[in-house]
């Protein structure tokens, strides 16, 4: 870093005596760490309460794997009466995208996973352990970096990029492990006076951690999910404060999770190899380390092989995809819990009406290997979730989605009274309709109930078994002129269709037709299909009686007439 970045006041003639003086030279105006230790006291929580966080970087869209981690973290915290907070890790500001923080906050809101603490908008936050944006915690990190320098556990590094490239080239030529460590750490053994002289001369520098580790030694670590794992010790002198004065991820993680009193760090297993470094940082800073739980990634079947869901290849990798498709947030969360704990599926079967919040989630029972993403199963869960909603709920969710993604559907739903009748078909029964898996299905599944949509798109009537046009026309004529009465109850309605079938030479019972197929043209089910197709242009719909009750006499009469005209 340039001294100007830190507002360093250099007294060129001051004699540097020890590490504390060097620390003061580099960070003269930062507070002592005791100030922050007092400012962020232990949380007043019940015994056993877990404090977790979701700590994404605003460098792109929110990945479904990120939402998965957030759901697990939130579930564990809620179960124990703990705290789930949102921290934005925005120290890599070159990669930050516009509205990145807003996208993160909105994704959690969309899935009803708003944090107890942390960022609640691009600029606003709640909680007593902030700031919750790392870019606003610069002085905090510098205070702890100063502490390490004063202890001889960190040092300024003046190596240029050219020098670092040269080190790497020599390591590659010698076929040895690359990195800034041991004899390759050129600035590690500079004396305090040498470092001070370079600083006074205005040489740019960064701050590195002085690792006490040796690669030939092993550490044993118990991960909450992965179990016992052995690693070589970290011996890399990693950068902890960059040239711009901001911390690296590793250093910020240790400082933040200490001051915010995170008890469990739940994150992707791509960070598993960083555990030795992170534990080392916690130890050298004098912090109690949190427990780590490394989640396996969500996988995809790719031509018989497994690979991670890719931001580049797979649209379903983005959380925004589920919103655009209109997959209910509750369905997505339920599906993710399904792959998180193998016991969830049986629990759901035994408790079909309970909230997912009542499931006894076990972090240590998560799979150590990545689960395959199954869109079919997710949509099936979506059908179940929507089937349990009231007509009013389905209407409201459909309208909210349509206003953003389907202008035609939004216009169609303007008549709320009629829409509620449509959505009420086969809803509230013991076996409610399950034809809608996501809000983008709504137009297809109810469009035929609206005349403009029906007449605008009907181009054929798939009558199936009965193909004789004269018979079809006569069925339609007789039904509207002789048998239809909108005040009939369901049994009377169906009995009349049976009478119509018999009058036309069809079996009034399916079993009669099967017993003597030669005696009948077909059976009552086929006659019902003619009416269904004439009224909806579909062979498969929810309950036909309920559909006709909603359509009403005038619509029915007109549709049967149009269907008859279509036969000519």
Predicted regions and their residues:
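Glycine- and acidic
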Residues: 52-59, 85-90, 259-265, 316-318, ...
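Active-site cores that bind ATP or allylic diphosphates and position pyrophosphate for catalysis
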Residues: 155-294, 299-309, 318, 476-487, ...
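Catalytic adenosine-cofactor/nucleotide-binding cores of aminoacyl-tRNA synthetases and other
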Residues: 285-466, 536-568
């Amino acid at each position: 870093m340039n001294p100007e970045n830190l507002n360093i006041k250099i007294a060129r003639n001051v004699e540097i005596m020890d590490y504390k003086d060097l620390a003061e030279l580099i960070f003269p105006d930062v507070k002592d760490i005791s100030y922050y230790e007092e400012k962020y006291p232990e949380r007043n929580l019940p015994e056993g309460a877990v404090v977790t966080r979701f700590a994404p970087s605003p460098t792109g869209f929110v990945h479904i794997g990120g939402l998965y981690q957030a759901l697990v973290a939130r579930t564990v915290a809620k179960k124990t009466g703990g705290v789930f907070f949102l921290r934005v890790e925005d120290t890599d500001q070159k990669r930050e995208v516009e509205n990145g923080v807003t996208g993160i906050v909105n994704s959690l809101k969309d899935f009803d996973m708003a944090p107890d603490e942390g960022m609640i908008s691009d600029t606003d936050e709640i909680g007593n352990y902030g700031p919750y944006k790392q870019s606003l915690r610069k002085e905090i990190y510098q205070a702890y970096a100063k502490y390490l320098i004063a202890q001889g556990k960190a040092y300024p590094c003046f190596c240029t990029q050219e020098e670092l490239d040269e080190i790497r080239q020599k390591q590659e030529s010698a076929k040895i492990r690359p990195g800034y460590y041991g004899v390759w750490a050129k600035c590690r053994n500079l004396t305090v006076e040498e470092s001070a002289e370079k600083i006074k001369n205005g040489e740019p520098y960064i701050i590195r951690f002085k690792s006490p580790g040796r690669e030939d030694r092993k550490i044993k670590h118990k991960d909450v999910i992965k179990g016992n794992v052995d690693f070589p010790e970290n011996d890399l002198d990693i950068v902890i404060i960059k040239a711009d004065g901001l911390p690296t991820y590793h250093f910020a993680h240790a400082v933040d999770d200490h001051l915010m009193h995170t008890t469990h760090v739940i994150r992707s297993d791509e960070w598993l190899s960083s555990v030795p470094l992170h534990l080392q940082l916690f130890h050298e800073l004098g912090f109690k380390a949190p427990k780590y739980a490394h989640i396996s990634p969500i996988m995809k079947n790719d031509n018989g092989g497994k690979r991670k869901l890719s931001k580049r290849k797979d649209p379903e990798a983005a959380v925004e995809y589920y919103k655009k498709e209109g997959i209910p947030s509750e369905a997505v969360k339920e599906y993710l819990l399904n792959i998180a704990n193998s016991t969830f599926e049986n629990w759901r079967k035994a408790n079909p009406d309970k909230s997912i919040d009542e499931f006894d989630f076990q972090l240590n029972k998560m799979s150590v290997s990545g689960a395959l993403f199954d869109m079919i199963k997710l949509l099936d869960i979506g059908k179940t979730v929507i089937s349990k909603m009231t007509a009013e709920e389905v209407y409201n969710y459909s309208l909210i989605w349509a206003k953003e993604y389907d202008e035609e559907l939004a216009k169609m739903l303007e008549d709320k009274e009629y829409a509620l009748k449509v959505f009420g078909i086969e809803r509230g029964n013991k076996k409610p309709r399950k034809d809608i898996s996501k809000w983008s299905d709504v137009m297809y599944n109810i469009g035929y109930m609206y005349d403009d949509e029906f007449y605008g798109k009907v181009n054929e009537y798939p009558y199936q078994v009965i193909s004789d046009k004269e018979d079809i026309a006569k069925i339609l004529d007789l039904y509207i002129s002789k048998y239809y009465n909108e005040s009939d109850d369901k049994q009377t309605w169906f009995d009349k269709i049976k009478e119509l079938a018999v009058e036309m030479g069809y079996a009034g019972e399916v079993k009669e037709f099967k017993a003597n197929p030669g005696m009948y043209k077909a059976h009552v089910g086929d006659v019902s299909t003619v009416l269904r197709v004439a009224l909806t242009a579909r062979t498969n719909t929810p309950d036909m009686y309920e559909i006709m009750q909603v359509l009403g006499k005038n619509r029915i009469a007109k549709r049967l007439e149009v269907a008859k005209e279509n036969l000519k």
